[in-house]
Amino acid sequence: ITSSLEQYEPCEVLFYAAEVLAKLMGSKDVAIYTVANRSYARLFSATSEKARSLGNSINYSEMDAMYTVLAGKKVYINKNMDERYPLMANAIYSEDEMQLILMIWGIPWERMTLGQANMLTVIGYLIQNAVVRANRYISALEQQRYIKGTNILEPEAFLALVKAYLNARDKGLTQCALLSVDTKENDRDEVGKRLIKLLRQSDYVGELEGGKMYALLANTSAKDATMVRERFEKEGVSCQIQEDVFV
């Protein structure tokens, strides 16, 4: 498992961990949420519409039945088939901090057993190192690779993220959109600041070759991207939806 994940760039690992998990658990419906703080987690990758059903952001601390079990570092099994929860879930920890929540649907009742729970625990341990390392890499990327004095990612770092997201989108592991932003030489920093205020924590602003500015919107469908673009335009940020990057 770990070797199959190690073939990917660090910023791709979390996407393909969902694919590996789905294969090993024999389910088409798997989601991975990254824990943002002690209450909220954000959807990072999902293998189906069903796996996206809880939404892009969840208050996991209020999902009592599941949270209590995960906080005790055990696998949650949804024995009551409560539709508000996945059928099984497991949390990945690093130094006693919850980092990720793995969620599974699409498995028959007879497979929701202690044996499967143990298997999910083992898979969690196996992908933990690759995934925690990838998570740290992305955090470091965000901290260290900004263009000096701005919150705009420099081209090499931004291109790696964009390619990872677009490849994962093409494989159905995530939804995302890329907006090219119109800037002039003298207002780039101002537009960048305005843009960052309009974006969510999970989105990115960066430059590609030639100094062109882009916004990468995570967990955003084509329909949502159109609405985001319209909202940006109203705030004075002119942009277009870009289908791909040609670099």
Task: Cite the ranges covered by each PLM segment.
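Conserved helix-loop-beta segment at the catalytic/binding core of cyclic-nucleotide signaling proteins
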Residues: 185, 192-224
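Amphipathic alpha-helical "output/dimerization" segments
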Residues: 111-132, 138
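Short regulatory/linker helices and ligand/cofactor-binding micro-motifs at input modules
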Residues: 1-12, 145-152
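A short, aliphatic-rich beta-strand micro-motif
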Residues: 77-78, 85-93
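Structured interaction and signal-relay segments at domain junctions
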Residues: 6-7, 16-73
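Short hydrophobic/glycine-rich mini-motifs in sensory/regulatory modules
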Residues: 92-103
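Active-site-proximal structural segments of metal-dependent nucleotidyl cyclase/transferase enzymes
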Residues: 158-183, 191
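Short beta-strand-to-loop transition segments that serve as allosteric relay/switch motifs
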Residues: 101-111, 217-219
